[in-house]
A protein has these predicted regions:
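Beta-rich, blade/repeat-based domains predominating
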Residues: 54-56, 81-92, 134-145, 186-208, ...
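Short loop/turn segments immediately following beta-strands, especially the blade-tip
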Residues: 64-70, 117-123, 164-173, 226-232, ...
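A short beta-strand motif characteristic of beta-propeller blades
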Residues: 74-79, 127-131, 189-193, 236-241, ...
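Asp-box/WD-like beta-propeller blade repeats and closely related beta-sheet repeat scaffolds
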Residues: 124-201
Length: 402
């Protein structure tokens, strides 16, 4: 059940060890922690968290982001939910979808996908319903471009699921009434600790909505499944085989629809793909490092998120352990990348980050520093500049702009 709760005040922040950040977060705040809403300059931004006793989170948080000056209001708890580690918005309606990354939803060995309605004025979320993800540990969710289906990837279960969306935003079950809405991956790869079996780590619809692309870390494949959002079905189609032990994790299409990128968790690389939209096929054409040359001790390092700048000129990826954002310039004709460097996030464990729709700002989630770091993006070079305004959020692991 969802409900609004008091904002992150000094007493709760003291439990997180974040009181020193409160002053920079509460800029022009209103009751409930939201900035005055100017539709031309501010928008809602949601934060998914890992939940538990402090300093962990309690669910999904919401704030307002001002794209004019790059300020973020004090976050408010928008909905209580267990481990809402990834979020996705409906493309046209006020609905948000979240995974509950657990292995015991409704007394079964699966996680769940949750549908929530958005109050446009406050950002508060009301739960509509939830459905089984069909596997344990769902860690990624997306919505097809038509807004007719939700897609989720199960890390523990090593599978992918498609759930139809009702007109009121609620989710239809996949497994009971529509077995064609579920795919179980199979196989393993060379890393015995992390690749003993399939581990779906992301799922993204193609720009035309005909395919769903799944990075499976456990089998070193980027799988392209045929998608029929109207029927709520997915089916195996093609697959790109990655370097053994690379561990593809997250994926992003370029705005030109001809190129795409994966970030590979285990070997700290980014791979560039040519994408044949008609055939639904990916071809790897370039792979390069996410960290600067000369770093020999990479113990404890792994990558996490990848995103393409709205202009298509730059690509960014996050490094955990190194705790930085890798920056790349894009060659327009080929989609290939040139490494620009890695900017420290001034926090720990950037599991996720997001670029605001204006393309002027990047927000990085420090999972283990319990805060969000704000960066200005140089529109000519793509380089990041830290604004000096970290904002406290408990155990943030996903950032989504509305």
């Amino acid at each position: 059940m969802t409900r609004n709760t008091p904002r992150l005040d000094r007493r709760s922040l003291a439990r997180f060890g974040l009181t020193g950040l409160l002053a920079s977060a509460a800029i022009g705040s209103l009751p409930g922690g939201l900035l005055a809403a100017d539709p031309d300059t501010t928008r809602l931004v949601y934060f998914g968290t890992y939940t538990g006793a402090p300093p962990q989170g309690a669910g999904i948080y919401v704030a307002r982001f001002n794209a004019t000056d790059g300020t973020l209001s004090e976050p408010t708890l928008a909905a209580e939910l267990r481990n809402p580690s990834y979020l996705a918005l409906h493309p046209s309606q006020p609905f948000l979808y979240a995974v509950s990354e657990v292995a015991d939803a409704d007394g079964k060995p699966t996680g769940s996908v949750v549908a929530l309605a958005i109050d446009p004025a406050t950002g508060v979320l009301t739960q509509l319903n939830h459905q089984s993800s069909g596997g344990s540990g769902p860690c990624a969710v997306s919505v097809d471009p038509s807004g007719r289906a939700v897609l989720a990837a199960n890390y523990g279960g090593g599978s992918a699921v498609c759930l139809g969306i009702e007109p009121d935003g609620k989710l239809r079950p996949a497994l009971a009434g529509n077995p064609a809405g579920f795919i179980q991956h199979a196989g393993k790869s060379v890393n015995p600790a992390r690749q003993e079996g399939p581990h779906g780590h992301s799922i993204d619809p193609s720009p035309d909505g005909r395919f769903a692309v799944v990075c499976d870390l456990g089998i070193d494949k980027v799988l392209v499944h045929a998608l029929d959002a109207g029927k709520g079905t997915i089916a195996p189609h093609t697959a790109a085989t990655m370097a053994p032990g690379s561990g593809p994790r997250h994926f992003a299409f370029h705005p030109d629809r001809r190129h795409a990128y994966s970030i590979n968790e285990l070997d700290l690389t980014v791979t560039v793909f040519d994408f044949d939209a008609q055939a639904g096929a990916l071809e790897p054409v370039q792979t390069l490092s996410t960290i600067p040359a000369g770093i020999t001790d990479r113990s404890g390092f792994s990558t996490a998120e990848i995103a393409v700048h709205p202009s298509g000129k730059f690509v960014y990826g996050s490094n955990r352990g190194h705790d930085s954002i890798a920056m790349y310039a894009v060659d327009p004709p080929t989609g290939r990348l040139t490494f620009l460097g890695a900017e420290p996030i001034r926090g720990k464990t950037p599991r996720n980050f997001a670029i605001d729709p204006s393309g002027k700002w990047l927000l990085a989630a420090g999972q283990d520093s319990h805060g969000v770091s704000l960066f200005a993006i140089d529109q000519a070079s793509g380089k990041l500049s830290f604004t000096g305004r970290p904002v406290p959020v408990p155990a943030p692991v996903c950032i989504t702009f509305r």
